């Protein structure tokens, strides 16, 4: 049974595009269906969180709006001199909750997600994920692209499985 839901941001919660203003400000587009899916999971007692390699105030604001339980900014796939990896962050959350990685659903789309996707019990990726990600043994390739409701597709499957 899934006891924790974690996801990457770019390419999963967003379409992977980055919008820049003339002043150099960055904007990201999030799908409201994905946000509602995580709200519904939290209401069902399943904590939710984000693991991203970016240090993004946009992502922080989105996580706060959704009242997500966990937010790890600036975590990558490789340990950079004292920095936490995505897998390390996932393990830290599991330790806090007293669960194993096999009870975690993670959605990722790029090579910096491979370690986490290979370790969790329910790995998922949008169809726009990198070929290396789609090739992970046991991964569930979603029908919906990132940023267009991919996360909602997963959260609905999790909730339907609990009924």
Please annotate each region the language model reported.
Residues 1-84:
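Alpha-helical substrate-recognition element adjacent to the catalytic core
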Residues 65-66, 70, 76-163:
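Mg2+-dependent phosphoryl-transfer enzymes with acidic/Ser/Thr/Gly-rich catalytic loops
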